[in-house]
């Protein structure tokens, strides 16, 4: 039932290749058509540029007052990836994100393979349909597609280390397991909390393996220590006024400690807020219900039969649903990608132990079908905010830019030498980020840029102080 025997043998590299093309059609096409934005690709690409020159980014790209970008998100991936910016330019982070997801899919393949074969990896040329369907489920998961449709984010890359963490721990390759622990932590200041919950959940699975338990305990101690040092010491020292991440939970407190205290002292309200719209805005109505339904249909329902793995999702759900930012509640953007490795690996690890053949087959065949259907729904009909033209690669509108002539924009961009300072509309800034001074309009006007490049809908009413250099009625280039 699970051995494919076509004339051309299907293997994992065929699946990876097809997924890579599909992901490039999402992410790279969006960038070519100026559907990537200042927040966040422009900001992070400019940070790469700064780090590649051995200096910190001062956040003036989107802030009036200079402050270290690491006080916004403590993201060390940008430092690690910065040399690549000299090779791939503004495409760097998009390529890194695509490659990382494919890397994560290979991790799913390896982990599910050893689960299916009771700890022994299958043949390199294996066409085991069970393992292939796990990969396909992962690559079709809605959180991954929606993340690809919106710029680059380091939590996507961090999540791709999790299947490898599962695999290396299962194989008792503890040095590589430790590498995965570190790589998850350094992505953002909230990643260690997720890591700690992952490792706590795994303790039940490895409860009879004393050595594995010691390594899990070590990972937990590292995660807690990293969280405390970064979130409670380093980031406040970089910006004493506010920790950006905590700004989304202001109603609970101004620090991790205050938020934790609020949760424990208001348990009923906390549980209620996980499911209802607690903001005075109708924009949040139905978003949480939609997300939970999508999560359950995409395999979350099967995870109910592996309850210790539900602990891995607790911090993910909490940071989404307890946030004051309504954008986090829904299925869109990068806010659901971490569920992919947990749910897919959990479901297939559980299915590998099912003795009833008909039940095992039902689960593993249903998973990619359900993941694909949910992703189609989120790309076409979701209530949550999703830029549909960014992710619908089978529609003509994905390959068009209706707001302006892209060839004209590229012509204007070539007129701006790299040494000049520029303030620009959001969609232009990722392409202008490889320079010392680039600013997001309109906040960047306070930095007195030499040139201003705007879309027509960003055009200010008063342009008397600006000298028009060129326009086609859709895009304007000014000198100041």
Language-model features, listed with the residues they occupy:
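Transmembrane-helix motifs of polytopic, lipid-linked glycan transferases
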Residues: 91-120, 164-167
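Extracytosolic helix-loop segments that constitute the early lumenal/periplasmic catalytic or substrate-binding loops
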Residues: 25, 44-69, 76-77
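Specific aromatic-rich, kink-prone transmembrane helix
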Residues: 107-110, 137-140, 156-181, 198, ...
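Signature aromatic-anchored transmembrane alpha helix within multi-pass, membrane-resident enzymes
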Residues: 13-20, 125-129, 217-224, 353-385
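Start-transfer (signal-anchor) and selected internal transmembrane alpha helices
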Residues: 1-25, 110-113, 123-131, 210-219
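Perimembrane helix-loop-helix junctions
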Residues: 194-224
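Hydrophobic/aromatic-rich transmembrane helices and adjacent perimembrane loops
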Residues: 98, 102, 310-356
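Membrane-lumen/periplasm interface segments of specific transmembrane helices
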Residues: 26, 40, 50, 57, ...
């Amino acid at each position: 039932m699970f051995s494919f025997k076509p004339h051309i043998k299907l293997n994992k590299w065929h699946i990876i290749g097809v997924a890579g093309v599909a992901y490039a059609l999402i992410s790279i096409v969006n960038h070519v058509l100026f559907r990537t934005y200042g927040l966040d690709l422009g900001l992070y690409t400019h940070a790469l540029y700064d780090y590649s020159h051995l200096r910190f980014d001062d956040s003036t790209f989107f802030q009036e007052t200079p402050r270290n970008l690491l006080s916004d998100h403590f993201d060390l991936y940008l430092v690690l990836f910065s040399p690549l910016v000299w090779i791939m330019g503004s495409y760097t982070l998009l390529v890194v994100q695509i490659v990382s997801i494919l890397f994560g899919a290979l991790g799913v393949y390896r982990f599910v393979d050893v689960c299916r074969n009771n700890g022994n990896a299958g043949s390199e040329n294996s066409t085991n349909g069970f393992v292939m369907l796990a990969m396909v489920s992962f690559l079709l998961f809605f959180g991954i597609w929606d993340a690809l449709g919106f710029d680059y984010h380091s939590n996507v890359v961090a999540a791709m280390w999790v299947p490898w963490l599962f695999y290396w721990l299962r194989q008792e390759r503890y040095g590589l397991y430790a590498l995965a622990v570190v790589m998850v932590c350094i992505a953002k200041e909230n990643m260690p909390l997720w890591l700690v919950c992952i490792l706590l959940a795994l303790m039940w699975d490895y409860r009879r393996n004393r050595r594995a338990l010691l390594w899990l305990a070590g990972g937990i101690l590292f995660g807690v220590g990293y969280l405390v040092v970064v979130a409670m010491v380093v980031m406040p020292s970089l910006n004493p006024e506010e920790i950006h991440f905590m700004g989304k939970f202001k109603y609970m407190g101004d620090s991790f400690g205050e938020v934790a205290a609020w949760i424990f002292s208001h348990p009923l309200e906390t549980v209620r807020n996980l499911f209802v719209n607690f903001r005075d805005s109708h924009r949040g109505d139905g978003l949480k219900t939609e997300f939970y339904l999508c999560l359950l249909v995409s395999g979350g329902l099967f995870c109910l039969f592996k309850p210790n793995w539900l602990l891995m999702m607790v911090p993910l759900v909490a940071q989404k649903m307890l946030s004051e930012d309504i954008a986090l509640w829904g299925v869109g953007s990068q806010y659901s990608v971490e569920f992919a490795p947990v749910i897919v690996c959990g479901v297939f690890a559980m299915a590998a132990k099912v003795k009833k053949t008909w039940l095992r087959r039902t689960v593993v065949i249903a998973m990619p079908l359900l993941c694909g259907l949910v992703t189609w729904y989120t790309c076409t009909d979701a209530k949550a905010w999703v830029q549909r033209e960014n992710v619908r690669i089978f529609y003509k509108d994905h390959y068009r830019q209706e707001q302006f002539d892209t060839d004209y924009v590229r012509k204007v961009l070539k007129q701006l030498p790299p040494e000049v300072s520029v303030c620009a509309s959001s969609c232009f800034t990722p392409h202008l980020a490889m320079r010392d001074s680039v600013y997001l309009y309109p906040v960047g006007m306070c930095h007195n840029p030499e040139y201003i490049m705007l879309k027509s809908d960003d055009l200010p009413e008063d342009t008397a102080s600006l000298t028009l250099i060129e326009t086609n009625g859709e895009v304007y280039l000014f000198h100041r």
